């Protein structure tokens, strides 16, 4: 796009959106120009901030006429650089932040309809106000927006019970690359009429269309919650504990987290909350929720059995909501503690649940063999197979080399290089290396069909 075309596009966007709807000053644009991890600094032509679906469609049409690429952006909390513009100065960031309305809450049908710019926690609060739960939950829920949550198919803490975001989306409203609007906000649990097209856009990271609203599934609010932290000797014991918890607590399990001893040592070293248990090679944080009154007794039975058979060496069952929050604060403090510890190479991987102990052992061996001095730090959602196998690398160990070692092991176990964070630009080239040529060809055919000019979030998911 030439400078003249660029200038003309900015002028036309300003005329359509007004002063509140377009940012051009460098200081105003700066927060939108770089990803949350600050790995991909960009320089957009401007930031468009439409306030309605109609305005989103108009922005898309104007950008298409000018041949300008569009980078949809919500809360900009993603960890793969999927919402960051490039440095060309020609891309338009399309921020959905002004579209923040909750359009409907149905406590009987258990649905909530929210616009793309609605912050996830705001949607959770709206559900709670009618004694319901929006089960999508993760660390960035106070900043992440519904559109980005859906576009990245976000995971989080409750996937073991409620599934990924994909499983909780009933309907979508999407603006396509030509500016047309597909309105599919049907709040139906059963709808078998034709192709389920909405699932193409869930997890597409803004490369196939711009999500402007979503119908999300709610759940009944459980009356009782049981949260426990257990010290376990190894991942094999944690896996046996998971099986025990499934047998005794069944569908009440809503979180089952595996945490390395190094993780909580880092939390303690950098001023985090106190660990109520003694030092241990590994820990498990498990939470169950139910409206049945016998939940606590069942949780106590699981804890007692784990201690008796030696799969847990110590444990604490929270006596109050405040104590449960303290246990979760340990888990949530790991990322910040890692950042304070120094340079880390992060991995968001998944393998079959039963293979987690063998995967961890194999990855540790591969790192020790090929990158001596690198320190692996594993934690994550054992209950759904998702492990954040992060590596505290030495100064001379390139991130690409670390990724190659870890992803080779992931591939050997039939796993995925991205369990919940998405591909973005951080993993786009790696995705092509790790998927079959037929899978990549199919993805490119879908992209070409829905975005033939390649103007929607180019370079994300699929490399240019």
Region roles according to the model:
Residues 1-464:
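Noncatalytic alpha-helical scaffold of FAD-dependent oxidoreductases
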């Amino acid at each position: 796009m030439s400078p003249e075309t660029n200038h003309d596009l900015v002028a036309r966007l300003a005329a359509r959106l007004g002063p509140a709807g377009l940012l051009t000053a460098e200081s105003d644009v700066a927060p939108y120009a770089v990803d949350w991890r600050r790995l991909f600094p960009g320089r957009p032509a401007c930031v468009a901030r439409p306030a309605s679906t109609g305005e989103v469609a108009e922005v898309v049409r104007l950008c298409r006429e000018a041949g300008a690429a569009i980078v949809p952006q919500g809360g900009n909390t993603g960890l793969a650089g999927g919402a960051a513009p490039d440095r060309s100065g020609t891309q338009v960031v399309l921020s959905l932040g002004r579209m923040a309305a909750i359009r409907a809450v149905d406590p009987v049908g258990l649905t909530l309809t929210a616009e793309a710019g609605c912050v996830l926690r705001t949607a959770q609060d709206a559900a709670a106000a009618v004694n319901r739960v929006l089960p999508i939950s993760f660390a960035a829920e106070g900043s992440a927006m519904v559109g980005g949550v859906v576009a990245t198919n976000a995971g989080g803490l409750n996937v073991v019970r409620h599934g990924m975001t994909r499983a909780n989306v009933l309907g979508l409203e999407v603006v396509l690359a030509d500016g047309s609007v597909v309105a599919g906000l049907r709040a139906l649990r059963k709808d078998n009429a034709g192709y389920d097209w909405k699932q193409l856009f869930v997890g597409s990271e803004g490369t196939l269309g711009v999500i402007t609203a979503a119908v999300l599934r709610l759940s009944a609010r459980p009356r009782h919650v049981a949260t426990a932290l257990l010290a376990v000797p190894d991942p094999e014991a944690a896996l046996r504990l998971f099986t025990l918890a499934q047998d005794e607590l069944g569908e009440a399990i809503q979180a089952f987290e595996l945490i390395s001893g190094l993780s909580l040592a880092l939390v303690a070293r950098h001023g985090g909350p106190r660990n109520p248990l003694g030092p241990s090679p590994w820990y498990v944080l498990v939470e169950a929720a139910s409206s049945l009154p016998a939940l606590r007794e069942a949780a106590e039975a699981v804890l007692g059995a784990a201690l008796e058979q030696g799969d847990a060496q110590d444990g604490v069952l929270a006596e109050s909501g405040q104590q449960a929050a303290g246990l979760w604060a340990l888990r949530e403090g790991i990322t910040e503690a890692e950042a304070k510890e120094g340079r880390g190479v992060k991995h968001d991987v998944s393998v079959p649940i039963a293979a987690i102990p063998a995967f961890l052992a194999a990855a540790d061996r591969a790192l020790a063999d090929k990158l001596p001095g690198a320190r692996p730090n594993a934690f994550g959602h054992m209950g759904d197979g998702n492990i954040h196998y992060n590596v505290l690398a030495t100064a001379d160990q390139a991130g690409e080399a670390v990724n190659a070692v870890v992803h080779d092991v992931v591939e050997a176990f039939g796993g995925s290089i991205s369990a919940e964070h998405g591909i973005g630009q951080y993993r786009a080239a790696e995705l092509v290396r790790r998927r079959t040529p037929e899978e990549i060809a199919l993805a490119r055919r879908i992209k070409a069909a829905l975005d033939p000019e390649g103007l929607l979030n180019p370079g994300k998911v699929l490399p240019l």
